[in-house]
Structure formats: C-alpha cells, structure tokens
Amino acid sequence: MPQDTEGFYSFVERYRTAMSGERTGDIVVDSFSELSARKSFRREWTDAFLKSMEMDITVSDYGTMKDLDEYLFGSSEVVGLFMARIMGLDEDSYPYARYLGRAMQYVNFIRDISEDLQLGRLYFPGRNLKDLTLKAWSTGR
C-alpha cells in the first residue's frame, strides 16, 4: 500500500474502477476485484480497509482505545474476515477471525514502534498508557 497521499488515492480510483467491472491493468487491483466477486466479500469490509489506510495518511495518533477501534476494524479485523471467507469458514467463525486479525495488528504495532514514531505515528493510545502508568512515546511533536 502506498504511503504517499497521491499514490493512495490513485490506488483507490483503480480499485473503484475494477469494482465497477472494468479492468485497470493493475494486477493487484484486478486480481483482488476478481477474488472479491468469487468469494462474495462484503463491500463494507473493503471500504473499511481503505478508510483505515486513509487514516494512516490523515491521523497521527489516537487518544483512547475507543478512538483506535475504527482503525483496527479496517486495518486488521476485516483481513481476518477476508481470510475466513477465502477459507470457506462458517459465519459463526467471524468474531474469532476479527479477534485474530486484531491480535496480529497489535503485534505489528509493537514490531513497528520505532518506524511509526519516525513517521510521526502513534497507534498506542496515550490516555490508555497513562491509565496503565506507562509514559506515552514521543512522536517528536
């Protein structure tokens, strides 16, 4: 996923074009569109994913876990839902697929703390860190 604003919005346009049934020439976008149709992905899952990727451009930190919830749904929980659908799992598994996606995102947050701070991003909510008597990491601002 592109980190730059222009690249991201160009990607979103190609995605929308592909979802309207038109080929884009972008193998990733066209293949996802085909997979999405074949596995009946819910459009709101992909919309949530794209919203979270946009938040990587527009939001630099989250005050509380509640503030982070929308980002987590789109950045990770829907990935679990996509995987459950690809694997043909029953919808009863969907809550667990969401939890697994969220857990993996927490691992990513921990792994990428240094890089995210260099990019001016902080995913661990400051208010919740204070509740745990942990100091918030500085983003240099």
What label would you give each PLM region?
Residues 1-141:
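Acidic catalytic motifs of isoprenoid enzymes
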